[in-house]
Amino acid sequence: MSAVPLRNNKPGRAEVRSITVLGATGSIGESTMDLLRGAPERYRVEALTGNSNVQGLAKLAREFKPGFVAVADPARLNELRDALAGTGIACGAGESAIIEAAARPADWVMAAVSGAAGLKPALAAVDRGATVALANKECLVCAGDFFMQRAAQAGACILPADSEHNALFQALSSGNREELVRVIITASGGPFRTWAAADIEQATLAQALKHPNWSMGQKITIDSASMMNKGLEVIEASYLFALSPDEIDVLVHPQSIVHGMVEFSDRSVVAQLGAPDMRIPIAHCLGWPDRIAGPSARLDLAKIGTLTFEAPDFVRFPGLRLAYDSLRTGRGATTVYNAANEVAVAAFAAGQIRFGAIARLVEATLEHWTRSGNQAPLTSADDAIAIDHDARKTAAGLLPQIAAKAS
């Protein structure tokens, strides 16, 4: 039994739904809060968490009046308590408090804590059978099989909250699993879509951060420039929808209007279109199984005029190839891929390596891990976190060597 409901056969919900937002002060969290703000009669906030933006978190808490608020940094607990003095809102700090927030009895949980730190809180929500809007990549990239099995066992409902997987989720409902031929994830191509390989190699941080369509944080914008983000999305799609690598294609689509497509055995291709606005897929998750009115601009195809598509270049963007390789390898390779990429992106942002060295560091880390013989199925969150930790350590150790080769 899948934890992702590919057929909408549930009745709509008229009652007020209780909501928890993990990562409320991040970009996904802010979009979620914006949607909640627009429909106070439909939603009641149970708990909110944030990383280190205590004042932003406190402001949201005063507005939405949740029962519990938690900040990830334990050293900020007193600051949070002071900011919420007189409200009667319970406060917590640290990993245990974030997990406590996720475990509270909310109908719907937005899992938007970034990084490996988001895995255990998401599992806490899953274990009580909640509906979880999943915006944390690491839950799937680092522990996909384990995470989805646990969700199915608990009777949890996993709704993909990012634009591409939400598009596939919507399109897949048009047919049955045995009728599926492939899914197609679209990619903008990023700022270097038309650049020569030699120019991509030397790209600066400022150039990498000039995404043509989306407004995102630094790390994901760099991932978009390298197409590592699309590699991560291929991995996520495989675990979310139980697809083999051969059933997942990537298509470059510079306008970012078509977010995902599904081809069925009768050769019909069903696509989901929308403006590049994260509130659209989040609204779909928030309203599911109904649809709710959202604040996003309506799509005007006549104004856009032209939609174009092209094949991805695995030579200029080797990070995409490495994602497919790690997915086929399995047994923790996707965890290594993600961890090494995070180390590489941080090194590039700090000026330690060239842009082109990001993929080389990821590949070197994967090769080192393969030679180590430490591959084994993941059976717990701690297994995934241990592989993630070891891969980061390996990547950091290989960093001087990769940097020297590029100089």
From Swiss-Prot:
Residues where Mn(2+) binds: D162, E164, E233
GO biological process: isopentenyl diphosphate biosynthetic process, methylerythritol 4-phosphate pathway involved in terpenoid biosynthetic process
Keyword 4Fe-4S carried by entry: no
Cofactor: Mg(2+); Mn(2+)
Residues bound to 1-deoxy-D-xylulose 5-phosphate: K137, S163, E164, S188, H211, S224, N229, K230, E233
KW Repeat (keyword) present: no
Pathway field: Isoprenoid biosynthesis; isopentenyl diphosphate biosynthesis via DXP pathway; isopentenyl diphosphate from 1-deoxy-D-xylulose 5-phosphate: step 1/6
Keywords (A to Z) from UniProt: Isoprene biosynthesis, Manganese, Metal-binding, NADP, Oxidoreductase
Protein EC: 1.1.1.267
Disulfide feature: none
Entry binding sites for NADPH: T25, G26, S27, I28, N53, N136, E138, G217
Gene Ontology molecular function terms on file: 1-deoxy-D-xylulose-5-phosphate reductoisomerase activity; manganese ion binding; NADPH binding
Annotated catalysed reactions: 2-C-methyl-D-erythritol 4-phosphate + NADP(+) = 1-deoxy-D-xylulose 5-phosphate + NADPH + H(+)
Top-level EC class: oxidoreductase
Pfam families per record: DXP_redisom_C, DXP_reductoisom, DXPR_C
Biological function: Catalyzes the NADPH-dependent rearrangement and reduction of 1-deoxy-D-xylulose-5-phosphate (DXP) to 2-C-methyl-D-erythritol 4-phosphate (MEP).
Family per similarity comment: Belongs to the DXR family.
Listed name of the protein: 1-deoxy-D-xylulose 5-phosphate reductoisomerase
Native source species: Bradyrhizobium sp. (strain BTAi1 / ATCC BAA-1182)
